[in-house]
Regions:
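Active-site-facing substrate-recognition patch
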Residues: 1-67, 202
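PRPP-dependent phosphoribosyltransferase catalytic core
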Residues: 2-13, 140-202
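Short, well-ordered alpha-helices that flank and scaffold nucleotide-derived cofactor binding pockets
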Residues: 59, 88, 92, 141, ...
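Short amphipathic alpha-helix with an adjacent loop that forms part of the alpha/beta core around
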Residues: 66-68, 112-118, 185
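Short glycine-rich phosphate-binding loop at a beta-alpha junction
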Residues: 66-80
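Short, glycine/charge-rich flexible loops or terminal/linker lids adjacent to PRPP-binding catalytic cores
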Residues: 81-124, 132-137
C-alpha cells in the first residue's frame, strides 16, 4: 500500500532535491540572520512534486474526523500568494467546494475575491510555510469578520518558533523545522566566521 503521508525526512529530501531548501548564510527582509532558507515555489514548479506534497498535507486533514465529516462543504484558504499552489492542490485532493486566497495591500491583508458575510464554508487555512504565524493570525481575523468558522490549519513546513495551534485548532504540517535566528549581525555566528551573506525575500 502506498504511503500517502511521507515521513518528514522524505519531505525534506524532496525540498533539497528541488532546491526549495538551502543551507548557507541568509539575511531575511526583517534583517534577521539564519543558516537555513526555504523557497517553496521551487518545489511547486514541478507538477509531480506539487501533487505529492499537496496530497500528503490533505491526508493530514482527511484523517481528522471533525474535518472529513464536513467535506466537501469546506473552503480552503491561502493566506498569501506563496500558499496558493498548495491551496489549489489540497482543495483538489479533498474535493473541497470552495477556495479563497488573501493578499496584503497597503499593509492590510484582505481576500482577493469579494466576499460577503456568511458566504464562506467552514475553513481550512493552508500555506506553504509558517515562520511566525503572523499571516495565519491575520487571516483568522478576516474569517471572524465574515463569520466563517476555522476547522483546520496546516502547511508543508512549520518552524518551531511559530505557534502549533490557532485557538483550539492544531496546526498540521509535513515538517516541523527548527532553525536558529539571529536578530542582527552582532549575534550571528556566520557573521563572526566571515561567511558571505545572501539577502533573500519571501
Amino acid at each position: 500500500m502506498v504511503n500517502l503521508i511521507p515521513s518528514p525526512e522524505a519531505v525534506m529530501q524532496i525540498l533539497k532535491r528541488t532546491g526549495a531548501y538551502r543551507e548557507g548564510h541568509f539575511v531575511y527582509p526583517s534583517g534577521k540572520h539564519t543558516p537555513h532558507y526555504f523557497q517553496m515555489p521551487l518545489a511547486f514548479r514541478y507538477y509531480d512534486t506539487a501533487r505529492v506534497l499537496a496530497v500528503a498535507l490533505s491526508r493530514k486533514f482527511r484523517v481528522d474526523r471533525d474535518i472529513s465529516s464536513q467535506l466537501p462543504k469546506v473552503a480552503v484558504i491561502s493566506p498569501s500568494s506563496g500558499g496558493i499552489p498548495v491551496g489549489f492542490g489540497v482543495r483538489e485532493a479533498l474535493n473541497a467546494e470552495q477556495i479563497y486566497w488573501a493578499e496584503k495591500e497597503e499593509g492590510k491583508r484582505r481576500f482577493r475575491q469579494y466576499v460577503n458575510q456568511g458566504e464562506i464554508n467552514p475553513c481550512i487555512i493552508v500555506d506553504d510555510i509558517i515562520r511566525s504565524g503572523g499571516a495565519i493570525e491575520e487571516t483568522v481575523g478576516l474569517l471572524k469578520e465574515l463569520g466563517a468558522p476555522l476547522i483546520g490549519c496546516g502547511a508543508i513546513v512549520r518552524f518551531n518558533s511559530a505557534p502549533d495551534r490557532i485557538g483550539d485548532v492544531p496546526i498540521k504540517s509535513l515538517v516541523e523545522f527548527e532553525s536558529p535566528m539571529y536578530d542582527n549581525s552582532d549575534d550571528c555566528k556566520d557573521c563572526e566566521d566571515g561567511v558571505p551573506e545572501e539577502h533573500v525575500r519571501f
